[in-house]
C-alpha cells in the first residue's frame, strides 16, 4: 500500500520519501531500494500506456520519490510534512513504529496510520500528540481508487480531520469520514457481499463466473452511479423492508433482516423520493432533473461496457 500512496502523492506534485523501518545491511537495502523503485517505474509505465501521462512526465514523477534506510529514519522524519505509517497489520509493531515516529517529527506534523483493520484508538496511545493522529484507509490500488476513508479517534482534533480531507482532495482523492469502527465503510460492506457471493457458489446457486457477471453488470453497474442508501430511497425503504422479511424467512437466516432504522423511517414517513425524504432529503430537489442526471450516467455506463445499441426498427 505504501508504494501506491507514494505514487499518488508524487503524481500530484509532492516529494515523497519511503522509509524502510527494518534494519538491513547496505547490500540488502540496495536490493530493497531497487525493487521499490522498479515497482514504481512499472506502475508509472502502465499509467503511461493508459494515457494518463507521457514518458517524460513519468520520469519527473519517479524523481520525486526517494527511499531511506532505517538508520536515516529519524533525520528523514524530522523534515517530513506529513507521515503515513504502512507497516504490517500487527498492533504492537504499528505502535512501536508510530511511537518512534512521533518522538522525532515536528510537533505540528500530522501522523496517519493506513491500517485496514485496527481501530485508531488502539494505536493513538503510542503517539506523543494523539490529537494530531488518525487513521487514513486507502483502497488498492491507491494511485487509482479515488476513495480514501478517514477515521479520527476520540482524541483527534477535528481541525486535523479537515486538514487531511483538504490535502486528499488536493491530490485528486475523494475522502469520506467515518467513526472509529471495525471495517471502516467499504471493507465492512465488502465483506458481507464477498461472503455472500462465496456462499452462493458453495450452495450451487450459480457458477462463480455468472455471480461475478451479475456483480459487474448489475450490482456494480448500478452502484457506480447510485449510492446504496440513495438506491434504497429510489425504490423506497418499504420495498427493502418487505424483501428482507421474505429473504429472512425463505433462507432461514437473520443476516437478511432489515435494521431498525428501516422500520423507523417507514413509521416517520421517510420512505424515500416519493415522500420527499428517506436517508437523504429530496424536499428542495428538482426530482425530474435529478433522475435524468442519474439515468444519463447509467447510459454512459452502458457505453463504457459497449452495451449501448440503437433500437431495432425493422
For the regions a language model picked out, list residue spans one by one:
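NAD(P)+-binding Rossmann beta1-loop-alpha1 motif at the extreme N-terminus of oxidoreductases
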Residues: 1-43
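NAD(P)-dependent Rossmann-like dehydrogenase/reductase catalytic/cofactor-binding core
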Residues: 12, 173-180, 203, 208-314
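Rossmann-fold NAD(P)-binding glycine/threonine-rich loop
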Residues: 89-166
Amino acid at each position: 500500500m505504501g508504494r501506491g500512496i507514494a505514487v499518488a502523492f508524487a503524481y500530484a506534485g509532492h516529494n515523497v520519501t519511503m522509509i524502510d523501518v527494518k534494519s538491513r545491511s547496505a547490500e540488502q537495502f540496495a536490493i530493497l531500494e531497487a525493487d521499490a523503485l522498479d515497482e514504481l517505474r512499472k506502475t508509472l509505465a502502465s499509467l503511461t500506456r493508459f494515457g494518463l501521462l507521457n514518458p517524460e512526465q513519468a520520469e519527473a514523477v519517479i524523481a520525486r520519490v526517494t527511499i531511506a534506510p532505517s538508520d536515516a529514519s529519524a533525520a528523514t522524519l524530522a523534515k517530513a510534512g506529513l507521515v503515513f505509517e504502512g507497516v504490517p497489520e500487527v498492533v504492537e509493531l504499528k505502535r512501536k513504529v508510530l511511537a518512534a515516529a512521533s518522538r522525532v517529527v515536528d510537533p505540528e506534523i500530522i501522523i496517519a496510520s493506513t491500517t485496514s483493520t485496527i481501530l485508531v484508538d488502539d494505536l493513538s496511545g503510542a503517539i506523543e500528540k494523539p490529537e494530531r493522529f488518525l487513521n487514513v484507509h486507502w483502497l488498492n490500488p491507491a494511485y487509482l481508487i479515488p476513495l480514501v476513508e478517514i477515521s479520527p479517534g476520540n482524541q483527534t482534533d477535528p481541525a486535523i480531520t479537515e486538514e487531511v480531507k483538504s490535502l486528499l482532495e488536493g491530490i485528486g482523492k475523494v475522502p469520506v469520514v467515518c467513526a472509529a469502527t471495525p471495517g471502516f465503510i467499504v471493507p465492512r460492506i465488502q465483506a458481507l457481499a464477498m461472503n455472500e457471493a462465496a456462499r452462493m457458489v458453495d450452495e450451487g446457486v450459480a457458477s462463480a463466473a455468472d455471480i461475478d457477471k451479475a456483480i459487474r453488470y448489475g450490482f456494480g453497474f448500478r452502484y457506480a452511479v447510485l449510492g446504496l442508501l440513495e438506491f434504497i430511497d429510489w425504490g423506497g425503504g418499504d420495498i427493502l423492508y418487505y424483501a428482507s422479511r421474505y429473504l429472512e424467512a425463505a433462507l432461514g437466516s437473520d443476516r437478511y433482516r432489515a435494521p431498525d432504522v428501516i422500520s423507523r423511517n417507514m413509521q416517520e414517513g421517510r420512505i424515500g423520493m416519493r415522500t420527499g425524504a428517506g436517508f437523504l432529503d429530496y424536499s428542495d430537489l428538482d426530482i425530474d432533473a435529478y433522475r435524468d442526471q442519474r439515468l444519463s450516467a447509467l447510459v454512459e455506463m452502458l457505453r463504457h461496457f459497449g452495451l449501448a445499441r440503437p433500437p431495432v426498427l425493422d
